[in-house]
Amino acid sequence: MKTATVFVLVALIFMTMTTAWALSNPKEKPGACPKPPPRSFGTCDERCTGDGSCSGNMKCCSNGCGHACKPPVF
């Protein structure tokens, strides 16, 4: 009985986390991220978590260490 309860709780936690992730990271916005200049390292701050966390048409892109919102390249 205890094993079944633990299994159900783990399954519920997994489903909740998966749903929360899917809602917080909508589909990728059009365009590509600009490439960071060679031998450059941006700040290691995570200023975005996905395209959905950037305003307008901005994309969440790597800056060489962390991520920041950047205008897309087409």
Curated annotation (Swiss-Prot):
One of its GO terms (molecular function) is serine-type endopeptidase inhibitor activity. Residues 26-73 form the WAP domain. GO terms for biological process: antibacterial humoral response; innate immune response. Its main location: secreted. It is found in: Secreted. SMART domains: WAP. It holds the Pfam family WAP. Keywords: Protease inhibitor, Secreted, Signal. InterPro entries: Elafin-like_sf, WAP_dom, WAP_four-disulfide_core. SUPFAM superfamilies: Elafin-like (SSF57256). GO terms for cellular component: extracellular space. It comes from the Eukaryota. PANTHER family: WAP FOUR-DISULFIDE CORE DOMAIN PROTEIN 18, WHEY ACDIC PROTEIN WAP. Could have proteinase inhibiting capacity. This is WAP four-disulfide core domain protein 18. It comes from Bos taurus. The gene is WFDC18.
